[in-house]
């Protein structure tokens, strides 16, 4: 444990790692720190999994968990293949054998999607079906697991909450910590969520390119761009970040937080068409009409739902709006669906996002070694200029199965755009780049 204290203390004091030992530092400089670290628990092995929809930076959180756990003395860092569902089938890998050197870690940070695989599996109520819990805790005992980390969104936090509650019920000493992840940015009690910044950066850059492309012909046209976001408009709102000195940004942004008003929408499009010959509209896939119907369902009909009651896929909102505009206003229209590109475009990942994803992974491990359980790591924004954040913790039960919407005051009065406050919030999250390692002209990734 002192070896870990040595590393962290040297970083805090700006002392080169190879230059001095802890013994050479004046005791008054580190007594309190060492006392705090020495109270940390000894954990032999840890287990980490990934769940839900992937992001461009979810593997950076995995890297943070792995490196921090090893630095703090964990002998083995095991990974769940395909989340909790794969774990129930004892699909487990030893990450010590998979991540053999620093280059593997750097490749992992730059690899999109979920390195370990994912699932959308919901644990049952243990009062109704206790068998999966008995099976899981048997595996924890078999592999001598002292802490479990689950990287995911709202539904994944439900898994951590259930495991922590069951662990308390059976008086287990295992620690359960949630690591936040979602491009939707809808987790409660955190300023923002790792994964969102990179998706927002991709959306802003793509919208900017579409605006350029749509303006090449001297004729009236409307391009409708469909962006992910089932119940919240954080991703669609990120289209506003395309605006700058060389671009006005999208002409309209429609969010799920406001019900779609067909008459007002067509009137606004007609008005804008008189001012400029090309329009670009960003729309969340989950926009509903005043009757609570998804616009996409008006095209394709209701689809299947997953284990958590969410529609498995939403698609067709942009097509619906493009057809509506063409039918009523007669101009040329095009529907563009960004789809999974929003969450896997690692060459456009935000370095800020990658860094914070790694940090929350490490903070989760530190929390477990301090004896915390049933918590999720959070990000607290200290300041905008300069942009600075700190990590914290919240009870995972406060986050599980809940959603954070775009504040009403960040949505324009007519409900068809966002205010400058939204951009001030989101712009720091898309800053800087982490350049991929290119081989034969394409990015190199790491795979199991």
Listing of model-derived features with the role each one plays in the protein:
Residues 2-10, 15-17, 21-32, 36:
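Short, positively charged and aromatic/hydrophobic N-terminal segments
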Residues 90-146, 155, 194, 208:
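Glycine-rich oxoanion-binding loops at beta->alpha junctions
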Residues 297-448:
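C-terminal non-catalytic interaction/assembly regions of soluble proteins
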Residues 45-55, 114-120, 146-152, 178, ...:
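Short glycine-rich or small-residue beta-strand-to-loop segments that form or flank ligand, phosphate
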Residues 77, 139, 147-152, 158-173, ...:
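Accessory alpha-helical/coil subdomains and C-terminal extensions
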Residues 41-92:
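N-terminal phosphate-binding or glycine-rich loops at protein starts, especially the Walker A/P-loop
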Residues 51-53, 80-86, 120-121, 153-154, ...:
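Short, ordered loop/turn segments at secondary-structure junctions
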Residues 54-65, 87-88, 132-134, 154-162, ...:
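Short glycine/serine/threonine-rich phosphate/pyrophosphate-binding segments
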């Amino acid at each position: 444990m002192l070896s870990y204290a040595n590393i962290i203390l040297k970083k805090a004091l700006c002392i080169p790692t190879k230059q001095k030992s802890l013994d050479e530092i004046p005791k008054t400089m580190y007594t309190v720190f060492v006392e705090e670290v020495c109270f940390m628990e000894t954990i032999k092995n840890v287990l980490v999994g990934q769940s839900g929809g992937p992001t461009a930076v979810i593997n950076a959180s995995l890297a943070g968990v792995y490196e921090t756990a090893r630095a703090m003395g964990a002998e083995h860092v095991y990974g769940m293949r395909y989340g909790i569902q794969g774990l129930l089938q004892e699909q487990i890998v030893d990450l010590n054998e998979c991540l053999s050197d620093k280059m593997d870690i750097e490749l992992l940070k730059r690899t999109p999607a979920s390195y370990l695989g994912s699932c959308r599996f919901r644990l049952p109520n243990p009062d109704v079906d206790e068998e999966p819990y008995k099976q899981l805790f048997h595996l924890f005992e078999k592999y001598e697991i002292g802490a479990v980390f689950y990287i995911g969104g709202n539904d994944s936090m439900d898994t951590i909450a259930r495991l922590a509650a069951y662990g308390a019920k059976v008086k287990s000493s295992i620690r359960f910590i949630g690591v936040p992840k979602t491009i939707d940015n809808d987790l409660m009690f955190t300023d923002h969520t790792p994964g969102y910044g990179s998706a927002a950066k991709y959306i802003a850059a793509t919208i900017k390119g579409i605006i350029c492309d749509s303006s090449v012909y001297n004729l009236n046209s409307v391009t409708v761009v469909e962006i992910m976001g089932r119940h919240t408009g954080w991703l669609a709102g990120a289209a506003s970040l395309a605006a700058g000195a060389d671009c006005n940004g999208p002409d309209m942004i429609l969010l799920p937080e406001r019900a779609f008003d067909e008459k007002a929408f067509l009137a606004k499009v007609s008005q804008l068409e008189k001012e400029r010959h090309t329009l670009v509209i960003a729309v969340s896939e989950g926009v509903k009409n005043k009757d609570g119907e998804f616009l996409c369902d008006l095209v394709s009909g209701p689809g299947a739902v997953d284990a958590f009651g969410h529609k498995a896929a939403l698609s067709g909102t942009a097509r619906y709006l493009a057809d509506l505009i063409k039918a009523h206003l007669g101009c040329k229209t095009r529907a563009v669906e960004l789809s999974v590109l929003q969450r896997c475009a690692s060459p456009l990942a935000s370095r800020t996002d990658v860094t914070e994803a790694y940090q929350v992974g490490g903070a989760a491990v530190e929390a477990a070694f301090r004896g915390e359980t049933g918590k999720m790591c959070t990000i607290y924004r200290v300041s905008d200029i300069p942009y600075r954040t700190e990590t914290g913790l919240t009870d995972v039960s406060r986050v599980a199965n809940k959603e954070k919407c775009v504040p009403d005051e960040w949505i324009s009065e007519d409900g068809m755009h966002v205010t400058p406050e939204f951009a001030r919030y989101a712009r720091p999250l898309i800053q800087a780049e982490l350049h991929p390692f290119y081989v034969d002209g394409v990015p190199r990734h790491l795979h199991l």
